[in-house]
């Protein structure tokens, strides 16, 4: 099975070390463009663009990268409860059309009560997933070309429709990650690819089995992906030394503050990440070549595969054997590590190199009439 390898645009900052200004670098449009173009040339399928108050806006970043890339896809966040499903569907179709079918979407429900309150969202964990399920139903139906009337607990629309459909049919693929039961239910019912953070293989196997069974109960099959950092070097010793350098400027106070911030979230996935290390710097290799040091201060994906090219490839193939076909990777700094992974890791894997998409000829159309419908030719009698 050929593997889809994604990279990451670090719109929330980048550098040589975690938790310090030492070795940090400015993340401006030029730098992000460099990373995107390297990923495009090296054959990465796409890039994940993060979301939240600590990041630049993912949609604007993605749109700005379209003209400077040829085949790279952009995995952009959908935020239920923050954006209406109709507006989000319109944005999604536009991004897909402008990128010539290179848009992918990542459903993000949010988990930090403080950040959510700042965004005007005051729903608890279960309510957010209810709202996300309703949002996704409306979003998908709109992109499928339906005119939608929907009267749910959280979402209400009447006569919602899109005038301009997406390039990808039936609609651009929808990704989603979540470890709670309600999250897995949502994935099983509505998404195309379920993402997990990089837990040890036995835990990932268990999670995939649960989601696969839930999807089968709905008569569906979904794909699986995993989010990991990678520290790959020419030798295993060099890779482990690089891992230690990455956290060499971290002090206990910074780790404690980060763990306290993570503790206030209601994310089951974040709780599972934190449990892998419990905020302690010792015993960070939690599974062969799987290192939890990143998660001492980084929210979300907190584990890295560490080793030389053949070793890391072997670990990736272990995950692939569980049914994972998409790997969303990152490394510090992201420009250099995109090259390093392409040079040291990719030759040991069956990487699916995307083709440059051919321009899609959109149907010619006149200006929308009364902002309501597209004029069609009327047969002459």
From Swiss-Prot:
Its EC number is 1.14.14.5. It catalyses: an alkanesulfonate + FMNH2 + O2 = an aldehyde + FMN + sulfite + H2O + 2 H(+). SUPFAM superfamilies: Bacterial luciferase-like. Keywords: Flavoprotein, FMN, Monooxygenase, Oxidoreductase. InterPro entries: Alkanesulphonate_mOase_FMN-dep (IPR019911), Luciferase-like_dom (IPR011251), Luciferase-like_sf (IPR036661), SsuD_RutA_monooxygenase (IPR050172). The keyword 4Fe-4S does not apply. Pfam families: Bac_luciferase (PF00296). The keyword Transmembrane helix does not apply. Gene3D superfamilies: Luciferase-like domain (3.20.20.30). It is an enzyme of class 1 (oxidoreductase). Signal peptide: none annotated. One of its GO terms (molecular function) is alkanesulfonate monooxygenase activity. One of its GO terms (biological process) is alkanesulfonate catabolic process. Belongs to the SsuD family. Homotetramer. FMNH(2) which is absolutely required for this enzymatic reaction, is provided by SsuE. Catalyzes the desulfonation of aliphatic sulfonates. This is Alkanesulfonate monooxygenase. It comes from Escherichia fergusonii (strain ATCC 35469 / DSM 13698 / CCUG 18766 / IAM 14443 / JCM 21226 / LMG 7866 / NBRC 102419 / NCTC 12128 / CDC 0568-73).
